[in-house]
Structure formats: C-alpha cells, structure tokens
Amino acid sequence: MIIHKEQVDCILPDGTPGKKLIVSYVDKEGNVKFLQYPIPKEQMFEWKYATKATADPPFQEYDFENNCFKIDENGNPIIRQWKSYDNKYIKRKEVNKLPELRLNELLNSFGKAVDPIFEMNIPNTWWCDIETDVTDEGFPDPEEASTPINTISLTKFPKTIIFSRKDLSKEDQQWVQTQIDNYSKDNNGTDITKGYEFEFKYFTTEKEMLEAFIDFIVPITAIAGWNFLGFDWLYIYNRCKMHGIDINRLSPTRNMTTFKITPRAGGNTINVKIPYHKIIYDYLLVYKTWDMTIKVKENNTLDFVASKALNIKKVNHVWGFKEFYEEHFKEYVFYNCIDTILLEHIDRVLRTAEIWFMLASVLRQELNTAFSTIAPTHIVMCNFMYPQYKVIVDNHKIGEDADYEGAFVWPTRPGIYKYIGGLDFALTYGAYAA
C-alpha cells in the first residue's frame, strides 16, 4: 500500500544530475519501507499526441522474464507501438519531472517485482488529540494557533501517553491510571479501557513539549485523530513554526506535501502540510467518506460516534475548558486520554480505515489519492491499458482551443437554444462558476 511517491534530485549512475523516484509503502508488519529508483534519462518524458510521421516508432515486444524478444506461433516478431487510449499516434516529450500518470506507467513497467508495494497492510497507528489554551473569546483558530497547546495525548495499546506543559503529582497520575482502568466498566460494563498503561511526560515550556513530541513520532508509521487534519495537526504544525521547531525532520526527505480540505457546505479550502512518507490522517474524514456501519448519523462528533460504536461516551464534565485546565487538571488529563482510547476502539469496531487502505491497495494508488474522485479513475484506466501498450495523454488546451469539458461537464455545442437549464449538485468548480 503506497503512502507517497516523490521525485528528488540525485546523481545518476553515469555521474550526471537526474531524478530519483522514492516510493514509501506499508509492509506486512505495518512499518514504512521504501523503493528507490534512479530514473534513467530516456524515461524522463511525457506523452503527447502526434502525427503518424512524428509518432513513437513501432518496436518488437520483449519478454523480460525470459530475456528474449517475443515471436508469434509462425516465428514472426511481435511488433507493438505505443498509442493513446483513443488509439491515436503519440510521441515522447522530454520533461524535468514526470507527471503522475507517467510515474504510474513506470511502476507498471516493473511487473511483479513491485507487487509488495501494493499489498493491503494495516499501518501501525498512534491516536492523537490535543487540548489548547482557551481564552474568554473561545477556542482558537488552528490556522492562527494563537494560544499554546496544553496537553497532547498519544495512544496505542497498551500505552496512553500525555505530553504536558503543566506538572501532575505522582498521586494524581495514579488517580488518572485508576480512572482509565475503570472508565468503561463503570459506564457500560466492558473492559475496553482496561489494560492501558498511563505515562505522563512533563515539560517546562511548550517548545520543549513539542520538540519531544516531534522526536517521538519521527519513527511512527501513522498518526491519526478525530478532526485531526483541520484542527490538531494544523495547530501543532503552526505552533512548531512559531517556535522555530524543525518539523520537516518528520520526513526522511525533509519535504512536505499539501493535503487540501474543502468544506462541503462551503467555506475556504484549508491547505494542510503533511510530511512525505508518513501517514497523517483524519479519522473523521475517513468515517464521513466511507462508513456504512452507523446507519443514522445524527452528527459526526466523537461523542456520538463512540456512543453508537462502543455504547460509551466521552468523559462528561461541567466546567468550561479554561476552568477545567486551571482548577481540575487531573480530570483534564483523564479527559484527554479517554478521547484517544475511544478513537482506537472505534477503529477496531468500525474498521472504516480498512476500506480506505483496501481502495488504495486494489487501485494501486497513493493513500490520499483515494479521497479524490477523478484521479483514481485515471489511474485505474492507466493500469488496465498499459499492458495493451495504450496510455493516457495530456491533451491540455489553452487559449482559443480550450473547452469546458471536464469530469462532470458535457462538451460545449455552439448554437441557439430556446431553453437552457443547469443542475448544481455540490458544485466542484465553484470558483470558476462565480
């Protein structure tokens, strides 16, 4: 199961500068592994439509398994020619960076040798939740991240860990441990919260706490939470930037990619930076996209979903979050721990993330591409047609040749019409419609 594909600068075996393809994937043990391939210069191209005279020339098909050219039953060479999916002539155009579909063709060309990168394996995941300082104006905007992070909860059975910039006595730490052990038994008679070992990590400053948190998650395969990308991770990222913390070290290539969150009900798109080759995801987004277990979704809060999936709710409290933190800190820490413990068990019961992992594996695409609507279709088409020596060609038009045809748009037909109608089902291209 592919996490990310990335092209980085390198020195090729012949001593010249070029590109190297790095593919991160999840192995059978749930850990991150890498495929690295210096891309030969003759492979640095994209396909363009051509005439018969300028087209890529025919060639004799080669059998890589047996290291010989292929012939038919009559002993004649089997001749092939690369063409577009619509059976038109094409040619190669040199590029400095391969487009996504060319990367997919490259992986297809490796045959069964790369089958392990497409296996459906479950990543080792830590569940995360943060609590921030709250002012009289309410909760801070994660894009501004104007107040410090108070605590960070990380859970993966049998550990539940709190990173905190406020200390907690040993006696109160033991109280939290006891409350965790008994929480599910007291609320629904189960043992789902029993067996977790509570660990408390105190730091004198928020910067020290965030540095330790980043150090802790560097070797982790996956980290997830509820509404995690749009709040928790975005908040952590922005607070790290404010403190000058090197968050890029989360990626082995020290590079970041962007995950875009667009609210379905409108609003501005949020661009969230995610390190290459690490799985950082939002279980709320996964749940809203693929869950079919909870039939009636009154709302998408963690409290509601936990009550339906586990028959247990979040820790109830009567205080405002400012008072909660300042005057009832041990309960505050306990509250933070239970959120991540419940989320871990929601995943075990609903198994919604496995649908996401399965789609990425079966469709042979990156994990986050599975959230898209168009890209997966292109990749599936590419995978299907490549063995037939057919490819998808970039036919982008500009200027007067441009058309409006797209994913859900019919070709424009110039003419005079008496009646014109338009149907907008959560318009994908709202910015253009304006």
List each model region and its residues:
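Residues immediately flanking
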Residues: 128-132, 228, 283, 423-425, ...
